[in-house]
Amino acid sequence: MSVTYGFYNSKNKDRRYDAIQMSSIFDGIIRDGILQHVGTAMMVKESTGMMVNVGIGRAWFNHTWTLNDALLPLTVPQSEVILNRIDAVILEVDSRESVRANTIKIVKGTPATNPVKPSMIKTNDRWQYPLAYIRVNSGVTSI
């Protein structure tokens, strides 16, 4: 398995701890962010074609941890015909009861003559943290 995560509250007794209780033991010791001395700190690098690889690393956000223990290949969505855009490789922490997971994925930007970085979701139960931004020029077939 490449991406693992924790701590989340129990649902139907599938966990025996309260997530906030478990995670709070790290308050004052670990600050939110990517741990810079683990692997390549989730560094994003171009691969072949429209692929990028997210490097090995560990993160701590919103009382949850994420471990990426192998290169994680992601496919950048196909470029636009006329307009450019900026995509974001993000780590998403989703504590909604129906989800309870951390994921690494690409958020597609809005095509424009002068593109801007996509906005990150920051709500009470869902947060997105950018790992890298990728400029996708019109008509390209590789990053």
Label each region the model flagged:
Residues M1-W60:
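N-terminal "first-domain core" detector
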Residues Y5-K13, M50-I143:
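Beta-strand-rich solenoidal segments
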